Curated annotation (Swiss-Prot):
Function: Specifically methylates the pseudouridine at position 1915 (m3Psi1915) in 23S rRNA.
Chief subcellular location: cytoplasm
Binding site for S-adenosyl-L-methionine: G104, L123, S124, R125, L126, T127, L128
Provenance organism: Marinomonas sp. (strain MWYL1)
Catalytic activity: pseudouridine(1915) in 23S rRNA + S-adenosyl-L-methionine = N(3)-methylpseudouridine(1915) in 23S rRNA + S-adenosyl-L-homocysteine + H(+)
Quaternary structure and partners: Homodimer.
Record-given protein name: Ribosomal RNA large subunit methyltransferase H
Annotated GO CC locations: cytoplasm
UniProt GO molecular function: rRNA (pseudouridine-N3-)-methyltransferase activity
CDD domains: RlmH-like
Length: 155
């Protein structure tokens, strides 16, 4: 199984890259976590934000492999517990699906990405910085894998 994290932004602070990499490298090759970085459209005081979001959305939609289950990360999505994430992930694995998780930039996801998603998931009702979401998702994917494999990380 492969979980592809498709996220807007490609110039992350060192702590984000290190945090993400720490959890991604812990996963076995048969349960790979792959990061696909979508360049963020330039932002300035005269930026047409909807146009920038559409451009990012175009790139995100192109990055989704056919056949993947698609999960859009949205503040108003469904909140899952870690156990629910592990159960859902195990079901996807048993059904032979790979998964693409979509994380928007500072102005959110293109509505077409949300429409393309099979499910929407929320980490919190709080608005989280999009770089931090990468680290949290990587840790939660790793934690779900440990639950599925009776690993002592999740107690």
């Amino acid at each position: 199984m492969r979980v592809r994290l498709i996220a807007v932004g490609n110039k992350m602070p060192k702590w984000v890259t290190e945090g993400y990499d720490e959890y991604a490298k812990r996963l076995p090759k048969d349960f790979a976590l792959e990061l696909v970085e979508i360049p963020m459209s330039p932002r300035g005081k005269n930026t047409d934000i909807p146009k920038a979001i559409r451009k990012e959305g175009d790139s995100m939609l192109e990055a989704i492999p056919s056949g993947d289950k698609v999960i859009a990360m949205e503040v108003l999505g469904k909140e899952w517990s870690t156990d629910q994430l592990a159960d859902q992930t195990e079901q996807w694995r048993m059904d032979g699906y790979n998964v693409s998780l979509l994380v928007g930039g500072p102005d959110g996801l293109d509505p077409r990405c949300t429409a393309r998603a099979d499910q929407t998931w929320s980490l919190s009702r709080l608005t989280l910085p999009h770089p931090m979401v990468r680290v949290i998702l990587a840790e939660q994917i790793y934690r779900a894998w440990t639950l599925m494999n009776n690993h002592p990380y999740h107690r």
